[in-house]
């Protein structure tokens, strides 16, 4: 293996780190859209947070693992104002400072529809004691931890759920056995679908659904649509591709192609 190829297996030097964790932030899609930038990774983050917000029922206690700059909060204020509580965990003081700034702006717009707490902690270490949560978000963050620490964090997330509670977990989909080259070198370890399912089940959860949230190349989308739904779905996709901006179509079409999608959203449940 050449030195250049070997580099692809390691987190890029200069990536913001705290110990073994990458604290590189996910795209701030709100800021990007405000200046006219619409790219699939930003729209992916918007979509996955909107999926969660629209599914939060009244009175739900919500935990955001590795909450970063608090990107889930605007959609929760807008679409789920009747949740009972939000708690955000993150290892980075800088990330939490951004989240608090965002919350201040949201409170000016929406008031205080639900209490919000931010807690600085290492999510792979023992967590503070909380009452059980009905919803746990763990979006686009697992890949920022080494594998074994990620397994521990998933066990803690599973233990934090009330019976019947739901974990929304998203992470890039890696293919083949480890060691694997990183798709994004701000990450530490990228998981295969099988590794995620194994760790989630070991945490006492069942996987109810898996959807793509970031697409492969269009020819791979076409191939999986044909396998799943037949030639009519391919014609439909191509018809949309001729009309719909790619960033929007990529985000939506990825939901239907989880076998080839480059990022997945797992919907996992603690049995009642």
Predicted regions span which residues?
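Short alpha-helix
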Residues: 189-204
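A short glycine-rich, Lys/Arg-flanked "PGG" loop and its adjoining helix->strand segment in the class I
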Residues: 151-163
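Class I SAM-dependent methyltransferase SAM/SAH-binding core
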Residues: 71, 75-124
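A conserved beta-strand element that flanks and buttresses the S-adenosyl-L-methionine
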Residues: 137
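Short, glycine-/aromatic-enriched active-site segment of Class I SAM-dependent methyltransferases
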Residues: 169-188
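A C-terminal cap/extension of S-adenosyl-L-methionine-dependent methyltransferases
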Residues: 168, 212-272
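N-terminal, positively charged/glycine-rich alpha-helical extensions of SAM-dependent methyltransferases
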Residues: 1-32
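Conserved alpha-helix/loop element of class I SAM-dependent methyltransferases that forms part
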Residues: 42-58, 75
């Amino acid at each position: 293996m050449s030195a250049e190829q070997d580099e692809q297996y390691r987190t890029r030097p200069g990536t913001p780190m705290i110990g073994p964790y990458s604290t590189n932030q996910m795209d701030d899609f709100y800021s990007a859209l405000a200046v006219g930038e619409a790219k699939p990774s930003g729209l992916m983050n918007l979509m996955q947070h909107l999926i969660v917000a629209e599914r939060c029922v009244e009175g739900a206690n919500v935990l955001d693992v590795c909450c970063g700059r608090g990107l889930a909060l605007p959609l929760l204020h807008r679409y789920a104002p009747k949740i009972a509580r939000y708690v955000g965990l993150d290892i980075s003081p800088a990330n939490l400072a951004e989240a608090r700034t965002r919350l201040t702006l949201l409170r000016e717009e929406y008031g205080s529809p639900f209490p919000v707490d931010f807690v600085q902690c290492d999510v792979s270490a023992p967590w503070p004691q909380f009452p059980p949560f009905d919803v746990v978000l763990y979006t686009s963050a697992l890949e920022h931890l080494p594998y074994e620490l990620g397994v521990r964090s998933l066990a803690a997330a599973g233990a934090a759920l009330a019976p019947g509670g739901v974990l929304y977990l998203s992470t890039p989909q890696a293919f083949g056995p480890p060691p694997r080259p990183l798709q994004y070198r701000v990450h530490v370890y990228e998981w295969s679908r099988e590794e995620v399912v194994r760790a989630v089940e070991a945490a006492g959860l069942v996987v109810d659904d898996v959807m793509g949230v970031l697409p492969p190349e269009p020819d791979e989308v076409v191939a999986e649509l044909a396998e799943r739904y037949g030639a009519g779905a391919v014609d439909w996709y191509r018809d949309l591709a001729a009309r719909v901006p790619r960033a929007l179509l990529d985000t939506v079409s990825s939901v239907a192609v989880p076998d080839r999608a480059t990022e997945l959203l797992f919907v996992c449940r603690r049995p009642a």
